C-alpha cells in the first residue's frame, strides 16, 4: 500500500485539500432516516466507539458491536463497556456479514488489521465508515470496489460527542465520501444520516474530502490543540515556580486557566478572549503573541510540511512497528514532569484572575491559533476547515486538562494525536526556553499587569488587528450556526 495523497497529481491534491462546504440545515431534513431499518455494526468500543454508538441508538438506529474473540472471551474493557450499556456484542464472524454499515472506530494503528479482518466478511454493497481518514490517506488502504467508504468525523473527543448530544445539541462534524469507493452513489446519504444520528447536524456539518480531514486534523492536534497546550503548561509552570510562586497555585492557574481562557474563545473568538483583559494587559498580550508567532512560525511550517509530504506519518508508523517505543517513552517523561506531580491548590481562583494572571497564556493561545490557521490556509486548506482544527476544538481539549492535567488530555486524544503532540512540544519547549522565556516581564504571568496610561492610537490599531484577522471573520460566521453552544468550563 502507498500513501494515497502522494499518488495524486498536484491538481488532484489541491482539489482535495480545498474541498470544504458548509451544509445547509435543510439538507438534514430526513435526519438519520436513511440508516433506519439497517444494521450498523461498530468495531471498537473506545471513547468514540461507545459514545457515537450511544447517540446512534438514541437516534433510533440498530447498533451492535463486533469485537475480537479474545476480547469477548476475556471480558476486556471494550466488552464490558458495550454490554453494560445494553448493546448486542458478537464476534466479527457473527455480526459483520449482516451489517449494512461497518464503522471502524478502533485506534489508527489497528485500522489495517481490522479492515483486513472485516473486509472478507462484509456483504456485497455494504458500507465501511471511519471517523478519521488516516488509514485511507496515509496508509493507502485498498477497499473492495463494491464497498462504499464514508467518513463522519466529530470535531472533539468522544466524551464530548455524548455530552453535547445529551444537552440536546451536538458537535461540529466533517463528513466525506472516498472518491475511489462510491459504487452506488449513496455515500453522501449514508454519511449525512450517520452525522445526524450523532447529533452533529445541530452544530453544523462540513462536506470534506478524506484528504482535507486528515491533513488539517493532524496539523491542528499536533500544534495548537495539544502540542501548544502541553508546551505552554510545562513552560508556564516552571517559570512561575522558578520565580517563587507557590507550586500548588501555579499548577491550578495553569490546569484550569486554559479552560477558562478558551471558554471566552469559544463564545467570541480571539476578540472576546482579548477583551477580557485590561487595556494595558491587552497591549502586552498582543505584543507577546507577535513575538511568539515570529519565533514559532518555522516550527509550525515544518509540521505542516511533514504532514503534507507524509514524512510525519512514515515516522509514526515506524514507531508503531517498533512497539511504540518513542510514544511510550514520551508519555513516561510527561508523567514525571513537575507540573504533573505538583500538589493541589485548595484555595479559589476567580474567573477574572485566570485572565489577569495569565497574560502569557492568552498570548500563547492567540499565537498558536493564528499560526495554525495561517499555516493551514497557506497550504491550501480552506478557512472553515482551518478554523475548526485550530480554534473550535481548543476549549474541548483544554477541558480535558482541567480534569486530570496533561495525563487526561493524552488519555482522551488518539495515539496519533498524542504522538504528534509530543513531537511538537519536545521541539517547542527548548525553542521557547532559548529565545523567549527569559524576556518576560513582571505581570506577564502569575501577577496582574499594573495600570498605566494607554496610547489611544496604539490601542485602536491593536483592536483592529485582532478583529480583522481572517480567523475572526470565518469564526463569526461559523459560530452563527452554533447558537446552542453550551458552557463547558468547570474551573473554580
From Swiss-Prot:
Entry binding sites for Mg(2+) 1? 217, 221
One GO molecular function term of this record is: ketol-acid reductoisomerase activity
Q: How is the cofactor bound?
A: Binds 2 magnesium ions per subunit.
Q: What class of enzyme is it?
A: oxidoreductase
Q: Which Pfam families match?
A: KARI_C, KARI_N
Q: State if Nucleotide-binding is listed as a keyword.
A: no
**Which pathway is it part of?**
Amino-acid biosynthesis; L-isoleucine biosynthesis; L-isoleucine from 2-oxobutanoate: step 2/4; Amino-acid biosynthesis; L-valine biosynthesis; L-valine from pyruvate: step 2/4
> Ranges for the KARI C-terminal knotted domain?
209-344, 345-485
Q: Which keywords does the record carry?
A: Amino-acid biosynthesis, Branched-chain amino acid biosynthesis, Magnesium, Metal-binding, NADP, Oxidoreductase, Repeat
The record's listing under InterPro entries reads: 6-PGluconate_DH-like_C_sf, 6PGD_dom2, KARI, KARI_C, KARI_N, NAD(P)-bd_dom_sf
NCBIfam families from the UniProt entry: ilvC, PRK05225.1
- Family, per the entry? Belongs to the ketol-acid reductoisomerase family.
According to its UniProt entry, the function of this protein is described as:
Involved in the biosynthesis of branched-chain amino acids (BCAA). Catalyzes an alkyl-migration followed by a ketol-acid reduction of (S)-2-acetolactate (S2AL) to yield (R)-2,3-dihydroxy-isovalerate. In the isomerase reaction, S2AL is rearranged via a Mg-dependent methyl migration to produce 3-hydroxy-3-methyl-2-ketobutyrate (HMKB). In the reductase reaction, this 2-ketoacid undergoes a metal-dependent reduction by NADPH to yield (R)-2,3-dihydroxy-isovalerate.
Protein name, entry field? Ketol-acid reductoisomerase (NADP(+))
Q: Origin organism of this chain?
A: Yersinia pestis
Amino acid at each position: 500500500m502507498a500513501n494515497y495523497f502522494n499518488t495524486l497529481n498536484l491538481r488532484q491534491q489541491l482539489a482535495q485539500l480545498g474541498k470544504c462546504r458548509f451544509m445547509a440545515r435543510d439538507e438534514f431534513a430526513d435526519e438519520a432516516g436513511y440508516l433506519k431499518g439497517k444494521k450498523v455494526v461498530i468495531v471498537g468500543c473506545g471513547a468514540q466507539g461507545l459514545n457515537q454508538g450511544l447517540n446512534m441508538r438514541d437516534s433510533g438506529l440498530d447498533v451492535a458491536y463486533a469485537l475480537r474473540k479474545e476480547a469477548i472471551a476475556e471480558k476486556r474493557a471494550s466488552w464490558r463497556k458495550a454490554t453494560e450499556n445494553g448493546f448486542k456484542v458478537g464476534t466479527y464472524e457473527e455480526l459483520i456479514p449482516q451489517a449494512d454499515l461497518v464503522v471502524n472506530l478502533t485506534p489508527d494503528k489497528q485500522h489495517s488489521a481490522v479492515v483486513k479482518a472485516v473486509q472478507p466478511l462484509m456483504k456485497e454493497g455494504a458500507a465501511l465508515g471511519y471517523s478519521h481518514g488516516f488509514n485511507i490517506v496515509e496508509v493507502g488502504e485498498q477497499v473492495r470496489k463494491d464497498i462504499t467508504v464514508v467518513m463522519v468525523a466529530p470535531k472533539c473527543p468522544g466524551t464530548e460527542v455524548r455530552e453535547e448530544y445529551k444537552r440536546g445539541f451536538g458537535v461540529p462534524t466533517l463528513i466525506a465520501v472516498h472518491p475511489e469507493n462510491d459504487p452506488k452513489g449513496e455515500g453522501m446519504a449514508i454519511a449525512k444520516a450517520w452525522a445526524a444520528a450523532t447529533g452533529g447536524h445541530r452544530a453544523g456539518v462540513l462536506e470534506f474530502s478524506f484528504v482535507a480531514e486528515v491533513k488539517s486534523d493532524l496539523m491542528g492536534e499536533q500544534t495548537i490543540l495539544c502540542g501548544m497546550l502541553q508546551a505552554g503548561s510545562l513552560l508556564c509552570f516552571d517559570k512561575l515556580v522558578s520565580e517563587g510562586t507557590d507550586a500548588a497555585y501555579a499548577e491550578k492557574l495553569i490546569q484550569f486557566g486554559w479552560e477558562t481562557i478558551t471558554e471566552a474563545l469559544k463564545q467570541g473568538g480571539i476578540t472576546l478572549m482579548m477583551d477580557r483583559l485590561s487595556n494595558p494587559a491587552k497591549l502586552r498580550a498582543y505584543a507577546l503573541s507577535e513575538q511568539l508567532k515570529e519565533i514559532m512560525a518555522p516550527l509550525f511550517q515544518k509540521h505542516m510540511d511533514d504532514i503534507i509530504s507524509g514524512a510525519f506519518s512514515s515516522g509514526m508508523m515506524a514507531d508503531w512497528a517498533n512497539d511504540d517505543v518513542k510514544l511510550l517513552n514520551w508519555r513516561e517523561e510527561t508523567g514525571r514532569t513537575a507540573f504533573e506531580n505538583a500538589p493541589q491548590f485548595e484555595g479559589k481562583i476567580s474567573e477574572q484572575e485566570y485572565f489577569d494572571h495569565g497574560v502569557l497564556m492568552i498570548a500563547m493561545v492567540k499565537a498558536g491559533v493564528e499560526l495554525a490557521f495561517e499555516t493551514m490556509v497557506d497550504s491550501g486548506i480552506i478557512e472553515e476547515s482551518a478554523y475548526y482544527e485550530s480554534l473550535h476544538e481548543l476549549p474541548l481539549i483544554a477541558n480535558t486538562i482541567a480534569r486530570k492535567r496533561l495525563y487526561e488530555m493524552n488519555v482522551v486524544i488518539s495515539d496519533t494525536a498524542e504522538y504528534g503532540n509530543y513531537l511538537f512540544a519536545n521541539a517547542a519547549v527548548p525553542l521557547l526556553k532559548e529565545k523567549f522565556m527569559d524576556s518576560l516581564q513582571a505581570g506577564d504571568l502569575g501577577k496582574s499587569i499594573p495600570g498605566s496610561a494607554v496610547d489611544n492610537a496604539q490601542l485602536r490599531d491593536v483592536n483592529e488587528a485582532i478583529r480583522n484577522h481572517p480567523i475572526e471573520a470565518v469564526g463569526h460566521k461559523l459560530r452563527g450556526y452554533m447558537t446552542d453552544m453550551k458552557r463547558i468550563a468547570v474551573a473554580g
